[in-house]
Amino acid sequence: MAQLRIAIVGVGAYESSRAREYLATIQKLKDLYSICAICDRNQKSLEEAGAQFQVACRYSNFEKMLFIEKPDVVFVLVPTDGQIVFALTAARHKCHLITEIPYSLTLDFGDAVAEACDQNGVKWEIAENVWHWPNEQLKQKIVRKGLLGKITHARLWYKSGSYHGFNAIRMILNSEPTQVLGFAKELDMQSYDSYGGQQESKIWWENGVIEFENDVTCLYESSSASGKWGNHWEIEGTEGYLSGNELVLHSGRTTYSFEETYDQIGGERVLAAIGIGQSTSSSNFDPILWENPFKQYGISAADDVAKASILYSLHQAVTTGANLEYGRRHARRDMELWITLRKSAGLNNIWIDIPLTKPTDLEKRLRSEYIKNYGGDPVTDTADLLQSSFRRLSVMWSVAGWL
């Protein structure tokens, strides 16, 4: 299998950072990737990550790294506001791309990256993880097998980064959304520390209804009280429902919990499969099983499986011409749902059709806030913004209360 040379920009400030987790996963996929270089403006983080993962080629200047190393793939793991700048730069250097979620701050910004990739003949995968989790892949199989009968509706509670939740629902339903009704309000709240470390006393509440092509309705809520559930979703059909990681069938009112099996790989206990109906002799359906395609690498934790799946998707697209498993189309749609919900809320809660046909007022405010904070437009002033210090807390937070 062809090995691709991958460079990572943004190595995380801490050993437990998400970027370091990705580096650890990449190192396990030795037949797919070799880490040729890492890049970060924080010298301390750069040296720590270089030592931790034994990467000799370390850069603080991104373009210098691209010119010297000429990586096949660039993985952009900088803060959200900086992703478009580094992604556009890498694409213009004819590097294949993986970027962190979401698609982009606005649909137009993401479309600019997609266009740059097309113009330079490179692939772009977006690192949406939720639908790749083993439990979620099993849910997708359960619905495809028809155990729930005709799907009628879904319920979603998601506290931050709701494009993740929309992604989970869409992938289980395997259907396209057609229209959205949204409600949103900024609320006073007891003082708390935000993701960026600042004291905040406001929080956004959101509620929405999403209609899908197959006559399924999704009811969505995000609020400070959703901590009661955490991030939780349910899929209901005429024959039963999925709630969290349980299947309930109306016939006999039988509940089936997801069952995990493990193998010993290199002395480690590694997830081999997750399924339903294997150990229940009374079940009236054949067992349904998801098997871990990465167990030979010792990859076991749910989010590590997701990371490996994302990396594998791009590798296959580059080396074999296979379609990306997620890609721009899905990433755009998940972000578009959130933007459409806020458009509906801003227009006194009217139904809005999908796809959107022009930039929304929210997207225009996001672009204006970006220019105000960083001094330029990321699409037209890309080179000038490469040396900017991008904040951990995105303009999505200051404008919309989104993470």
Where are these regions (language model features)?
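C-terminal glycine/acidic-rich active-site capping loop/insertion
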Residues: Q199, E239-E325, D361-L403
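Beta-strand-loop-alpha-helix segment that lines the small-molecule cofactor/substrate pocket
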Residues: L66-I68, V73, P79-T80, I84-W131, ...
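Conserved SAM-binding strand-loop segment of SAM-dependent methyltransferases
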Residues: V55-F62
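Glycine-centered short loops/turns at secondary-structure junctions
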Residues: K94, G121, D215, N348-N349
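Short, conserved SAM-binding/catalytic segment
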Residues: A49-V55, V113-C117
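N-terminal Rossmann-like dinucleotide-binding module
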Residues: M1-F53
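Rossmann-like dinucleotide-binding domain that binds NAD(P)(H)
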Residues: I151-E236, E246-H250, R329
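Rossmann-like NAD(P)H-binding beta-loop-alpha module
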Residues: P134-H153
